[in-house]
Amino acid sequence: MRVLEGLQPAAALGFFETLCAIPHGSRDTKAISDYCVRFAQERGLSWQQDASNNVIIRKPASPGYEDHPTVILQGHLDMVCEKNADCDIDFSKDGLRLRHDDTYIFADGTTLGGDDGIAVAYALAVLDSSELKHPPLEAVFTVDEEIGMLGAAALDMSGLQGRVLLNIDSEDEGILTVSCAGGATSCLTVPVKRVPVQGKAWRVGVRGLTGGHSGVEINKGRANANKVLAAALQGLPVTLCSIAGGSKDNAIPRASEAVVVSEADDLAALFAANAAKAALPETEQHAEFYCEPAGAGEMLAGSEAVLGLLNAVPNGVQAMSGDIPGLVQTSLNLGILTTDADAVRLTFSVRSSVNREKFGLIDQLKALAARFGGSYSESGEYPAWEYQKDSRLREVMVEVFEAQYGRKPVVEAIHAGLECGIFSDRLPGLDAVSFGPQMHDIHTSRERLDIASTARTWEYLVAVLERL
C-alpha cells in the first residue's frame, strides 16, 4: 500500500509519491526528467527534453477550449537535499521515506521536496486527466532552480506558444505573487601594493550587528558592518593592512574588521570618537566597536582609494515601489569585503524589480570603481519580473480565489529572484502569477506539506484552468 493512499487530491498526491521515490537533487535530475518523458510517451503527448534535463510536455485543449490561449504550467524538478545527522539516506540513489499525520506530509529525516515536487505532481495530474476543462497546455519542468535557476536560463523557449504562465513555486496558500526582483552579483576590485609597515598596527572593527537576508530584510533598518566600519575609519590617520567583512553577497554582514597602521599615539581614542558618531539604527542595540594593538608586516599603498570607495558606494534600499505598498523596488548590499595579495574586493548583491533601475545602479557602481582606480566585474545576472498594472490572469485568479475561499487573496511581489523573471524576459507579453499550497520549513529536514491546503490548491488550480 502506498504511503499517501487515501489522501486527497488522490491523483496529484499519487504522482507526488512516485516523484519522491526518484532521486532528484539539484544537478541529479536525469532520472526524474526521464520519468516525465516516459509519462508523456505513455499517454501519446508531445514532449521535448533538452541536454540540461528540462522537459516540455504539450496537451491539446479539452473540447470547447480549442480557441483559448495556451497556458503554461511551470515548476522545477530539482529539490534541496538536506538530512539529519543520523539519517542514512543516500540522496543519489535512495527515494524519500514519506510519512504523514492528520495535517502534514513529511519525509523521515530529510527534506520533502514539496518545493517543488508538488508543482510537477499537480501538472502531471492535469495532463493525465480526461475530465478536466482547460485550454491548450504546455507543462514546463525546469531543473536546477535551487542552485541559480540554471535550467530556466538554459531552456530554449522559442517554441513555447503560451503567454499565460502559472508558476506553482510559492509556499504560502492565499498569496499570489505577481512580480520579483532581477539582480546581479557585482564585484569592485581596487588594486593595492604591499609596502613595509610605518607606524603602529591596530586591529579595529565592529561586531554584534543584527544582519539578515538582503532580499527579505533589507528594508528593516539593519546596519551593514562593512559600511559602518568604513565610516568609522573615515578621516583617521590610518593606512590599511587588510579589511574584511561578510561571507555571502546576499547576507547583510554582522561584523567587519581591519588591520590598520597609524603613527598617531591616540588612535584608539580617535577611532572611538568616530565610532560614536555612527548613526546606527535602533535595531543595533548590541553593536560593539573595538580597537586593539595588532601585529602586521606590510601595509597597503593605495588604501586611501579603498576607504574612499567604501564610503562612496551606495548601500541598502534605493527605491520603493509606487505600485505595491511596502515593496522594496531597488536595493544593493555590500555583502563581502576581502583583501587579497594585490587587491581589495567589494562584492554586492544588486536587486531591482525594474530592469532599468537595476542597470542604472550597476552603471553607478562601474563609475565609482573607475573613479577610485578600480575595475568592475559581474556574474549571475538575472532579469526582473516587472509588475503589470493590467493582468487578465491576475484578475481571473483573484475572482476564482474569492469565490472558493470567501475572501480576497494577498497580491504581493518579492524582492528576490524567481524563474518567472527569466520567462517574462524571454516571452514578450507574458502574463504570469506564482502560487502554491502551504508548506513549512522548506529546505530543512522539518519540511512539511499541508494536506488540506494541497487539496484546496488543487481545486483552485482546476477552477482557474476552467476560466482561462
What are the functions of these language-model segments?
Residues 327-416:
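Substrate-recognition/cap regions that form aromatic- and gly/pro-loop-enriched pockets
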Residues 101-106, 146-147, 152-351:
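Midchain, well-structured core segments that form catalytic/ion-binding scaffolds
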Residues 12, 329-331, 335-342, 349, ...:
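Zn-dependent metallopeptidase/amidohydrolase metal-coordination segment
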Residues 222-244, 387-430:
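Active-site-adjacent substrate-binding region
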Residues 158, 221-236, 264, 304-311, ...:
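His/Asp/Glu-rich mid-to-C-terminal helical/loop segments that flank catalytic regions of hydrolases
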Residues 65-163, 185, 198-201, 315-316, ...:
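Active-site metal-coordination/substrate-binding segment of hydrolases
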Residues 77-79, 140-148, 169-173, 210, ...:
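Acidic, glycine-rich active-site loops and adjacent beta-strand->loop/helix elements
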